[in-house]
């Protein structure tokens, strides 16, 4: 039993270390090899001296797109990544986590945000060429899990 516990801790620490190494780079943005819900993603970035990405300009959006296209794990048919926007405080008013600044620059998928079923409050980047989604934004349920983008502060 104790051996199993040590093994689980060792594996978890190895995963965390590998994920942290992906953020020990000179780039402004990083993509930890971690899957979390939106709050967990924000906490992970913060614990490691980063923040969930604030894509408040077209330039920052393009930087994330360019960097993401270089990540081997993202060379698939579908990628979804948390970013730091939500309307958790007030429905329909999207702000950047950590700053509280209103989202002004945006790159929503047509018809989004839609708050489907009344519980989509967190924003993710969505890349799925077969559906013509090219790193656009969508609102989704915050408790769903996916990888995410951290930004150096």
Curated annotation (Swiss-Prot):
Molecular function in Gene Ontology: carbohydrate binding
Compartments reported by the entry: Secreted
Signal peptide: 1-19
SS bonds (residue pairs): 45-150, 122-142
Organ and tissue specificity: Expressed in female salivary gland. Not detected or low-level expression in female midgut and fat body.
InterPro entries from the UniProt entry: C-type_lectin-like, C-type_lectin-like/link_sf, C-type_lectin/snaclec_domain, CTDL_fold
Gene Ontology CC annotations of this record: extracellular region
Cofactors: Ca(2+)
Key word Disulfide bond present: yes
Keyword Transport: no
Coiled-coil blocks: none
Superkingdom field: Eukaryota
Residue ranges occupied by any C-type lectin domain in the UniProt entry: 26-151
Function: Salivary protein with carbohydrate-binding activity; exibits high affinity for D-mannose. Agglutinates host erythrocytes. Probably participates in mosquito innate immune responses to prevent microorganism multiplication in sugar and blood meals.
Full protein name: Salivary C-type lectin 1
Species of the source: Aedes albopictus
């Amino acid at each position: 039993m104790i051996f199993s516990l040590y093994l689980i801790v060792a594996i978890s620490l190895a995963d965390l270390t590998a994920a942290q190494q992906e953020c020990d780079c000179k780039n402004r943005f990083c993509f930890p090899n971690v899957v979390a819900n939106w709050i967990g993603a924000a906490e992970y970035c913060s614990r490691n001296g980063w923040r969930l990405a604030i894509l408040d300009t077209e330039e920052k959006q393009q930087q994330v797109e360019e960097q993401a296209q270089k990540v081997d794990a993202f060379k698939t048919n579908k990628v979804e990544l948390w970013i730091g926007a939500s309307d958790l405080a007030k429905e329909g008013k999207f702000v950047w986590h950590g700053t509280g600044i209103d989202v002004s620059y945006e790159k929503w998928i047509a018809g989004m945000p839609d708050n489907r079923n009344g519980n989509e409050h967190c924003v993710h980047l969505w890349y799925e060429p077969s559906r013509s989604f090219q790193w656009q934004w969508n609102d989704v349920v915050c408790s769903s899990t996916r990888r995410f983008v951290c930004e150096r502060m």
